[in-house]
Every structure is written in C-alpha cells, then in structure tokens.
Regions:
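Conserved beta-alpha junction segments in alpha/beta enzyme cores
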Residues: 33, 42-48, 54, 191-231
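Internal helical hairpin/lid segments
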Residues: 215-273
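Short, acidic/small-residue loops that bind anionic groups at enzyme active sites
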Residues: 116-139, 145-151, 287
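Short Gly/Thr/Asp-enriched flexible loops that form oxyanion-binding sites at enzyme active sites
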Residues: 103-121
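Conserved anion/nucleotide-ligand pocket segment
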Residues: 145-212
C-alpha cells in the first residue's frame, strides 16, 4: 500500500470525525464583552444603541464593530469592511460572543473572505437570524454551534418579547432550552434525535453546493429547521424540490417549520404556506412540527441552538423540543 495515500486517508477520516463533533462555545458570565457587528445590511443607529442598552441591562459589556454603522449601497460597509469586523470579533480574546445588529442582505459576500478555520479556532456564539443564516451555516460546517435568535431590535423590545429574551439570556449563560408548543393540525407525529441545522430557507438554499452548505452533512442525521419571509409559495416549492433532487429530504430525521411571513395567499389552491409544505412533506415518514414560534415574527422568535443535538417529539397534543448536552 502507498504509505502517503494511507496517511492521507487516515487524516481525512480524522478530519471528518472532528467536524461531526459540534463544539459548544463557552457560557458567558456577568461582565463579559459582546461584540455587535453588521455582516449584512446597514442598521439603524438608534436600534443598535437600544440593543447595547439591553445588553448592559443583561450584565454584559457591548462593543460596536468599527464598521457596524456604515452605509455602503445599503450594506454596512464594503464586503471587506464587514469581513474585517467579523474577523476582529472572532480573534479578539476579550470578546466572548458576537451579536449581529440585523439581517437583510449581503452576508454571503462576507463568507468567502473568512477562512472556515477562523470559526474553528475561535468558537464563539454568533447570534442572529434571517441573512445571518450565512454565518450559522459557516459555523456549522466548521463544527461550531451558533444561536438562531433575536438581534438588536428584538432584545430591546419589551412586553410580549420578555419571555423570548429571558430564554436567550439563560442560553448565553449555558442553560439549554426545552420547548413545549401546542399541536398544529398538519403536524406529522413521531420522535427523532439529531443535530439541528437550518435557518432562513432562501439563504441556506442559496449556499447549495458551496463549501458553506451544511446540507452536505445530511448523512449525519439532521433535524432541519426552516423559516422565511417575503417568499412566494411557488419559490418555496422550488427550494424544496432542489433539496429533494439532492437527496437531502430523504435523509432528514425530522423537520421543524417556523414562521413564514409576508407572502401572498391563497396561491395555487393552497390556503397558506403550511398547507403547501404539508402537501410536499407528508410523503416522508419523519416527524414534522409546524408553526414553531421562531423566525420573522413581530412578537415571537424563540432562540434555537444551530448545531445542537436535539430531541424532537411531535405528539397528539403538543410538540416537545429538547436540546441535549
């Protein structure tokens, strides 16, 4: 046997094994620093100010990235400037977590400017949703967990969002969430345990075939979470077909469907997005939870650990989602 080829094969096996083991970033403590960056669209400065105030109330020290408030053709600076802020937040040892100011567009421009090894070397919670799915995907491929959750506007909100923010605060301190939500008439019953990956459907669909495509890990037994906004039923249908053609859907162990908002309905005879999704997903013998309160919603965006091991039980009366150490 060729010795060099043998050693290369062993190295590849070891690398694959390491990547399958998702790393949980360290829990935060009072006084820790959280960086606020803008990897996508330019944020409203007042929203960032309110987000900083909320983090201080939580007991943390917020620090805003050098380019986070810039506006360059709608983005928060050039792609290089946004990438520089992310690298700064990852590499600075005094920064313990990273919160994105907002989503929007443009996160994909940052991805190929950041070597995946940077996420592995500096495992930190990256918090956000929507277009921040790009960073969740990169961390997942690099073997690091992240948080699909509220950003500056969400954490600054009071009233109905208090319960959501309380869960995010506990999660940052190391307490994994357990959710029990009411049944939905379209739910598919069953139980499954696997690694939770996902986020904004249109964003992670746009990464298909790239080095940042977490669906390449479908063989590992994934539970997929998806949500979206401003996408028509026909476009979502096309994204599902794309996953089916790739052979991804048949490998999933379960699906959690979050909020789908701001789309035209009824369309093509379907009353709403969930009905269209059910028409498609009912042919797979896996548990499916509909209308989980996470994603683009004016009130509820409960945090999820992307890359975390989760037990999903979809029962007759309710759905239980428990993250496992």
């Amino acid at each position: 046997m060729n010795y060099r080829w043998f050693m290369l094969s062993i190295l590849l096996l070891l690398t694959t094994h390491v990547q399958c083991q998702m790393v949980m970033p360290q829990a935060l403590k009072a006084g820790d620093t959280i960086a606020i960056i803008s990897p996508s669209s330019s944020p409203d400065s007042m929203t960032v100010t309110k987000g900083c105030a909320a983090l201080r109330e939580w007991g943390y020290k917020p620090v805003v990235g050098p380019n986070a408030l810039k506006d360059y053709h709608g983005f928060a600076g050039t792609a290089d400037e946004r990438a520089a802020d992310l690298l700064w937040a990852l590499r600075d040892s005094t920064i313990k977590a990273i919160m994105c100011s907002r989503g929007g567009d443009g996160g994909v421009q940052v991805l190929y400017r950041i070597p995946l090894e940077e996420f592995t070397r500096h495992p930190k919670w990256i918090i956000g949703f929507s277009d921040v799915t790009t960073l969740h995907s990169a961390e997942a491929v690099a073997g690091v967990m992240s948080i699909h959750g509220s950003m500056c506007d969400g954490i600054a909100a009071k009233g109905e969002r208090d319960s959501v923010n309380a869960i995010l605060q506990r999660l940052l301190r190391g307490r994994l969430p357990v959710y029990q939500v009411p049944r939905h008439s379209l739910n598919q019953l069953g139980e499954a345990t696997g690694i939770l990956l996902g986020g904004n459907l249109s964003v992670f669909s746009g990464l298909a075939g790239s080095d940042y495509d977490f669906l390449n890990r479908a063989d590992e037994g994934l539970i997929l979470f998806m949500e979206d906004t401003h996408e028509s039923m026909s476009k979502v249908d096309r994204m599902l077909h794309q996953m089916e053609i790739r052979g991804v859907l048949s490998k999933l162990k379960g699906i959690i469907v979050g909020h789908f908002s701001k789309y035209k309905y009824p369309e093509n005879g379907f009353a709403d997005m969930y009905e269209m999704l059910h028409e498609y997903l009912q042919h797979y013998d896996i548990p499916v939870c509909y209308d989980f309160p996470s994603g683009h919603h004016s009130r509820y965006n409960f945090p999820l650990v992307i890359g975390g091991r989760v037990h999903l039980r979809v029962g007759q009366d309710s759905t239980r989602i428990e993250f496992i150490e």
